[in-house]
């Protein structure tokens, strides 16, 4: 242990992972950070190995991906781990964000930690989309065509931006080269931001379910919380092994098994399941430009939460109104995911429009309203309690 504290590099790891003081009452909802770190390592390692065999060419990309699964030693394992690892990464990411929303982890003094996390979330979405396009299958080709066309919503220079991104007049070899290069780079950027996220977190320490400062009641990270983290990591390993060996393509669309055909449009163009809520928001607004703005705002609104929530009580643990509306928001988010994966028929478009409206009403109206109402009730109750 003395060596861990005397060596400057090991001392840094010791301060963050072994001797770090953590609130004694944090629950398993605080384990998603370690799970995300574990999955990120898996994604980087498998991604580097897959890149050794991938060919960024419209003619050979699909064949190279199939060859990885058929001819490369343990290639099927690498491919399944990488594909399903992305899904697990988003599962843990959404749960991590949901825990932060529920317990008010975006409130001061952890606003910087929250903002870095939102940037990581946005970059993760971009990285996932880039990787989704690389196999050059039927769904990814048309998904790349549709999503990259969103840049045409930029006034005056939109069409030029699309052609610059494509490297031509359609999704082709230059497009795959650009996407492959960026997809290889982005995980390392996310890893660097994750370290910044960790540094910002340890500046003021972790929050806790009670939402109060707990500087006097803390325990060292090792062994108490490391053992706790290992439990959820082992559960994750069991889950991803089940998906890899028993249902490796469970999260994929059937059209992902077909090579790209520029002359034939799929019956329904949908992104991966973890991007469906934002795709539903895009489709819910008839105006193209406003739909793109709404989709982007639905992510960036998380940066405004520290300003929108000024409640005297941190989090929803002791806030009945906040708790009720939070679970309404969770249900609304699930409805958006369902609508995003459905055919764009009138009934689904209508439901998506109402769900999209509630999504923004929750952030811009409900949170400030029940915050003001809650603060007012607290102010009215304080004189009575003092008496």
Curated annotation (Swiss-Prot):
Source organism (scientific name): Schizosaccharomyces octosporus
Alphabetical UniProt keywords: Electron transport, Heme, Iron, Membrane, Metal-binding, Mitochondrion, Mitochondrion inner membrane, Respiratory chain, Transmembrane, Transmembrane helix, Transport, Ubiquinone
Family, as annotated: Belongs to the cytochrome b family.
Residues making up the signal peptide according to the UniProt record: none
Protein name: Cytochrome b
UniProt-listed PROSITE patterns: CYTB_CTER, CYTB_NTER
Gene Ontology terms: cellular component: mitochondrial inner membrane; respiratory chain complex III
One Pfam family in the UniProt entry: Cytochrom_B_C
